[in-house]
Amino acid sequence: MAKKRESPKLIKIKDAIKLINQQVSLIGIVLEQREPKQCRNNDWICTLRIIDDTYPSPGLTVNVFSKTLEQLPQIKNHDDMILFTRIKMQTFDSGERVNAACSRWVSSFALFEGVDFVCYQCSTNFHEEEALYKSAMDDLRKVFAGCSQVIKAMQSISYRTKPCSEVFSFLREIKIGKRFDLVCRILHADEDTSAVFVWDGTDAPPASILAKRSEEDKAFSSLSVHTLLSRDVLLSFPTVGTILRVHLSSHLFYRVKPGDWVKLYHLLCEVDRGSWVIKVTSSTKVHHLAQDDRLVEKIMRIYDKRLSSKLGHISFWCFPSPPGLTETDDNCAPFVTLMDIITFPKVTCKYRCIVRVVAAYPWQVEDFCSDENRRHHQVLLTLEDSTATLEAFLCNKDAEYFWGLGFQDTETLRKKRNWLLGIRESSNFVAPRNPPWIECCILSYYTNKADPWNTRLYRIFGTRLLH
């Protein structure tokens, strides 16, 4: 009969640091997790700092080794506990300091969360009976129960690469060509994790549109998030706040998943076809944050306060509303964002929103009418707010009401179109356009009853341009 494997005896960190070159087993609260690195032998290492009631400061540094990135500890929350077995205590810095090594051959670990200490990750060689350690975890939790704010403060400091030197920007503060650091939520990651979509609840500033006149006759090509992802994916996204795409090397996003909060360091913003594009630099880094990190909580407080406001679905950049540029027939309907419209659960509905008109197709006002008698008017306008772009038709009576004139006066119509799209009258060459914000009413409808969602379209109605 095989001899039953004995479970290792737990010791406290204060005692462990005295047992140099010996293997120990212990439980601690994770205070810090540093960015993983690849070793020369192609293994991976990440460094954790843990504490217990006997060694709350500065804590014990544990270097965890694994064959792959995915096998490294992936801390989910503040106050999560980690159980290490058979880690080796060792000295460094000429014997002045002590740390521990969690070998992938001999040592093992397990991570626990919640009041019931549910194990959510363990190394492949972890074979201990979890129940044997829950009493020790419960005792440790009770010791720190009244010190959670202190632990959070210590964790907030330890997540900094240089204490008191980090300054994070909101998306509403980005500028062309200026490097910045961002705290954001990952909403979606491509299958190969080469690109992610990020959000922080704020509105990126409207980007100037730079296009040659020869290009204006082409249909507008947008890089808006809704053109890159399916509607099913968009349904899980917030409908307020700008969502931007970030391209990163797959090794930087090796364990990023939707719902994660991260710090992105050393990003760079550019504008492509009127849309913001976030690019990485040679020094870009990704650091994970716990859901209850103070920075995350601050962002969500700001976002929740915005949603509670009647004007929360209006872009920050046109707040409170563009006065006197247009008038609408439905002044009682609440304002919505374009993402609200795109993800609305019904195919047909009426909406009121504040947008910019960033493109018109066809471009020449002489082509707005499709017949010689100039009775049938149709133009496709590309609308934009801080959340998305949306193409909406402006047709016939709705168009005549919108422009406030008949279609015979092409010169006046051209001036109104130029003002609406932010075109400078005197410019014949490449010039940036910055269209004004206008209030408008939009109707969603379908053209095929048998396939309503795939034939869903939009048109502007009940809106009059006053300029």
Swiss-Prot record:
One of its GO terms (molecular function) is single-stranded telomeric DNA binding. Expressed in roots, rosette leaves, cauline leaves, stems and flowers. GO terms for biological process: positive regulation of telomere maintenance; positive regulation of telomere maintenance via telomerase; telomere maintenance. InterPro entries: NA-bd_OB-fold (IPR012340), POT1 (IPR028389), Telomer_end-bd_POT1/Cdc13 (IPR011564). Pfam families: OB_POT1A, POT1. GO terms for cellular component: chromosome, telomeric region; cytoplasm; nucleolus. Changing F65A: Almost abolishes POT1A function in positive regulation of telomere length; abolishes telomeric DNA binding. Its main location: nucleus. Keywords: Chromosome, Cytoplasm, DNA-binding, Nucleus, RNA-binding, Telomere. It is found in: Nucleus; Chromosome, Telomere; Nucleus, Nucleolus; Cytoplasm. Component of the telomerase ribonucleoprotein (RNP) complex that is essential for the positive regulation of telomere length. Binds RNA non-specifically. Binds specifically single-stranded telomeric DNA. Not required to recruit telomerase to telomeres, but stimulates TER1 RNP repeat addition processivity. Component of the telomerase holoenzyme complex at least composed of TERT, CBF5 and POT1a. The RNA molecule associated to the telomerase complex, and providing a template for telomeric DNA synthesis, is most likely TR and not TER1 as described previously. Interacts with the N-terminal part of TERT. Interacts with CBF5. Interacts with CTC1 and STN1. Does not interact with TEN1. Belongs to the telombin family. This is Protection of telomeres protein 1a. It comes from Arabidopsis thaliana. The gene is POT1A.
